[in-house]
């Protein structure tokens, strides 16, 4: 990279785009703590103030992935992730977490990458820990759970220690930055397929383009009706679909799949205790019809991404049958056992 940091900042402030090597160098400088906090804050603000670019996101994600080497060989299994950007402010229950266990119970091997909530709501890590999942299990044990339980949970801080130095600045800024978008792109197990929810429609194409550049085989990026960062039951959802290396726009209408329209507040979560209650009930085949329907709808996207079904409708039916059996909760119990400390 021949440009100086002020030159790159000026480029961004004029609405320009970083090239692959420039974006990678910026991320490497952040990780090495080479920039002053005021410079980092300026870059984060400049990136945020115009549309994110797929090339930038993919380049930064590659650097972060390289900084988080696996402690053991990756299992030779086709893996799917269900991590989204968060930030929709809808206070819905942990839909993507329920989807992960439902998809696993349908036979998809799921490597879910997640964290605690950064917004004061309840994140996937918060609710899973509350239900008894060990978040601090040795990394080899986390990877091994894929073959034991067909699903694992990668607690982001344990896999990306290099980001710890940036945490105080991100907290001080108090706004969402490019790092919120990179979270779903830096699963250390590098899944083959992914369903990724975004909280604003303008993120559909950048995130889908980044997944394409990162070499995923199949993926669905979804912007939910009403502003959810997952498929919603309140109306038609907007999708970007990656298949055979090509991107296309699509829509997902729950009514066309036989699901009743529901207001967004039918999916509300609440505090940690209520989120735990809802998640356990849904995984056991209970919960409200709206809760089960939205999990089935989003699970259908995962099943398609994994190549297990050929249509959204087929995926919804398979997910509903699985939920009714209570098998998703059995997957949770299997994962909890797989992550229990040896001798614990």
From Swiss-Prot:
Main function: Catalyzes the transfer of the phosphoribosyl group of 5-phosphorylribose-1-pyrophosphate (PRPP) to anthranilate to yield N-(5'-phosphoribosyl)-anthranilate (PRA).
EC number: 2.4.2.18
GO molecular function, one term: anthranilate phosphoribosyltransferase activity
Binding site for Mg(2+) 1: 96, 230
Pathway note: Amino-acid biosynthesis; L-tryptophan biosynthesis; L-tryptophan from chorismate: step 2/5
Biological-process GO terms, alphabetical: L-tryptophan biosynthetic process
The protein, known as: Anthranilate phosphoribosyltransferase
Required cofactor names: Mg(2+)
Binding site for anthranilate 2: 170
């Amino acid at each position: 990279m021949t440009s100086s940091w002020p030159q790159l900042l000026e480029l961004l402030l004029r609405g320009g785009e970083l090239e692959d090597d420039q974006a990678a160098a910026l991320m490497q400088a952040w990780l090495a703590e080479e920039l002053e906090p005021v410079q980092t804050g300026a870059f984060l603000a400049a990136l945020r103030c115009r549309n994110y670019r797929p090339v930038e996101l993919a380049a930064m994600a590659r650097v972060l992935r390289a900084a988080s080497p696996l402690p053991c060989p990756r299992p030779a299994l086709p893996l799917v992730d269900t991590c989204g950007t968060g930030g929709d402010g809808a206070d819905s229950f942990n839909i993507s977490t329920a989807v992960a266990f439902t998809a696993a119970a349908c036979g998809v091997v799921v490597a879910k990458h997640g964290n605690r909530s950064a917004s004061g709501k309840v994140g996937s890590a918060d609710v899973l820990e509350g239900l008894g999942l060990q978040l601090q299990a040795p990394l080899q044990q986390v990877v091994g759970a894929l073959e034991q339980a067909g699903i694992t949970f990668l607690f982001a801080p344990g896999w990306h220690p290099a980001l710890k130095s940036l945490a105080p600045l991100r907290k001080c800024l108090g706004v969402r930055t490019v790092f919120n978008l990179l979270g779903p792109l830096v699963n250390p197990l590098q899944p083959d397929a992914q369903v990724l929810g975004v909280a604003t429609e303008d993120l559909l194409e950048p995130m889908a383009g980044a997944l394409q550049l990162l070499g995923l085989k199949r993926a669905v990026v979804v912007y939910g009706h009403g502003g959810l960062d997952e498929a919603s039951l309140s109306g038609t959802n907007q999708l970007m679909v990656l298949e055979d290396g090509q991107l296309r726009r699509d829509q997902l209408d729950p009514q066309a799949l036989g699901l009743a329209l529901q207001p967004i507040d039918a999916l509300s979560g609440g505090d940690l205790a209520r989120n735990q209650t809802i998640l356990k009930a849904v995984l056991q085949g209970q919960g409200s019809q709206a809760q089960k329907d939205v999990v089935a709808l989003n699970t259908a996207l995962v099943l398609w991404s994994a190549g297990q079904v050929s249509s959204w409708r087929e995926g919804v039916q398979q997910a509903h049958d699985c939920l009714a059996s209570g098998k998703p909760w059995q997957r949770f119990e299997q994962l909890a056992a797989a992550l229990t400390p040896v001798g614990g």
